Each structure stands twice: as structure tokens, then as C-alpha cells.
Swiss-Prot record:
Keywords (A to Z) from UniProt: Disulfide bond, Fimbrium, Membrane, Methylation, Transmembrane, Transmembrane helix
Classification lineage: Bacteria, Pseudomonadati, Pseudomonadota, Gammaproteobacteria, Pseudomonadales
Gene3D superfamilies documented for this protein: Glycoprotein, Type 4 Pilin (3.30.700.10)
One CC-aspect GO term: membrane
Propeptide: 1-6
PROSITE patterns reported in the protein's UniProt record: PROKAR_NTER_METHYL
Top-rank taxon: Bacteria
Record field: transmembrane: 7-27
Subunit structure of this chain's protein: The pili are polar flexible filaments of about 5.4 nanometers diameter and 2.5 micrometers average length; they consist of only a single polypeptide chain arranged in a helical configuration of five subunits per turn in the assembled pilus.
Compartment annotation: Fimbrium; Membrane
Membrane disposition: Single-pass membrane protein
Gene name as annotated: pilA
Protein's name according to its UniProt entry: Fimbrial protein
Pfam entry (one): Pilin
GO biological process: cell adhesion; protein secretion by the type II secretion system
Length: 154
């Protein structure tokens, strides 16, 4: 008689069970990682506009996000993001109070994950030149670790 070669059904079932357990642990971790990186990226995209806003304040111009700024206005030059709601320059709502305070607001949407869609990122400047960042209006699936350390959920 020849000796049998190969795996028994029990051995194959054990391997499938181990792979299932590993997948059950890895998939939620990956989804959290993806959401966290998307929030961090969106915060970075909005925060990158701080330099342009500072330049506008130094030049004494009104900060806008417009395709055709007037002579007294300064276009902050935002490039469209795949993570933010809206299209083009309308993705960032700019509030320039002309007293040195500025507010840049963006809402996560479009291709952002469902756990973070709808969260609002606000980067604001006080008249003393200090910039702050906060995340508000988070969806119910939001987890505290999604917010980067420099932009907490409030």
C-alpha cells in the first residue's frame, strides 16, 4: 500500500480558522488606520493655507478663496481635495474678520471614509497670531483616535 500524501480535512479547517481569526483582527485595525490617515491628510491640507493667510494679513488684504480675487483681496490658492465636500475653491470656507482673525473651515466628504464623513475641520487664527485647530460635528462612528494630536475633537 502506498502512503497517503497531503493534508487531512481537519488540518485544512484549522488553517482556515486561523486565517479567519487574523482577518477579524486586522480588518477593523486597517479601517481605523485609513480613517486616521484621511483626517490627518485633510487637516494638513487645510493647515497648509495658514502661510497664505499670514501673507494676506501682512499685506493688509482680505483673504478669499476665489478664482478671480480683486486688487484688495488675496487668493489663498487652495487646490481641490478628494476628501473634502464641494468642488474647487468652494471646499474651504474662508472668514476674514479684517481684525487679524481668520477662520478656514472644511467638511470631510467625497471619498473620505464613512466613519469620518461629515466631520468639520476648523483652523482659526486669533488676532495675536496664534493658530488653533479643532474638529467638530463628528459622525456617530467617530473614534477619539481619529483626530491628530494637533487638532483635537471639541
Amino acid at each position: 500500500m502506498k502512503a497517503q500524501k497531503g493534508f487531512t480535512l481537519i488540518e485544512l479547517m484549522i488553517v482556515v480558522a486561523i486565517i479567519g481569526i487574523l482577518a477579524a483582527i486586522a480588518i477593523p485595525q486597517y479601517q481605523d488606520y485609513t480613517a486616521r490617515t484621511q483626517v490627518t491628510r485633510a487637516v494638513s491640507e487645510v493647515s497648509a493655507l495658514k502661510t497664505a493667510a499670514e501673507s494676506a494679513i501682512l499685506e493688509g488684504k482680505e483673504i478669499v478663496s476665489s478664482a478671480t480675487p480683486k486688487d484688495t483681496q488675496y487668493d489663498i490658492g487652495f487646490t481641490e481635495s478628494t476628501l473634502l465636500d464641494g468642488s474647487g475653491k468652494s471646499q474651504i470656507q474662508v472668514t476674514d474678520n479684517k481684525d487679524g482673525t481668520v477662520e478656514l473651515v472644511a467638511t470631510l466628504g467625497k471619498s473620505s471614509g464613512s466613519a469620518i464623513k461629515g466631520a468639520v475641520i476648523t483652523v482659526s487664527r486669533k488676532n495675536d497670531g496664534v493658530w488653533n485647530c479643532k474638529i467638530t460635528k463628528t459622525p456617530t462612528a467617530w473614534k477619539p483616535n481619529y483626530a491628530p494630536a494637533n487638532c483635537p475633537k471639541s
